[in-house]
């Protein structure tokens, strides 16, 4: 657990907290910002992606999944936890926005070219947050 400005790793070690997630400092994969940044940079630089759009998008979400915040690991207030609410990327050339949410890891896409690009109305889409489980039997 982590609460800002509080060392929850051990009262026997004088750790100075500079980031939420430091309650796990010293454990492999701690949740501090610096550790998460280093882990995602390492993962990005050492992972292999295919040439296609779908493979690249899938790999992007796997890379960022290496630093997801899970509910319960980083407590910020009573009953409140730091989590990865959503993850997103965009193919700026094709105008496609991809996202996943905490509760729905299916990749959702919004193709901006399917809308009136010269329109004057704001277009909004509800986040698809309901988990979809694909039963194969």
Which residue ranges define each predicted feature?
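C-terminus-biased signal that marks the final domain/tail of proteins
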Residues: 4-137
């Amino acid at each position: 657990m982590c609460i800002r400005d509080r060392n929850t790793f051990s009262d026997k070690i004088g750790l100075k907290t500079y980031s939420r997630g430091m309650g796990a400092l010293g454990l492999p994969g701690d949740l501090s910002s610096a550790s998460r940044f280093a882990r995602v940079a390492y993962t990005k630089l050492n992972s292999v992606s295919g040439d296609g759009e779908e493979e690249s998008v899938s790999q992007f979400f796997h890379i960022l999944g290496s630093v997801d915040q899970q509910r319960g690991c980083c407590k910020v207030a009573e009953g409140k936890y730091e989590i990865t609410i959503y993850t997103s990327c965009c193919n700026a050339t094709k105008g496609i926005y991809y996202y996943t949410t905490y509760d729905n890891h299916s990749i959702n896409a919004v193709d901006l070219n399917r809308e009136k690009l010269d329109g004057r109305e704001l277009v909004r889409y509800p986040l698809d947050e309901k988990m979809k489980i694909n039963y194969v039997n």
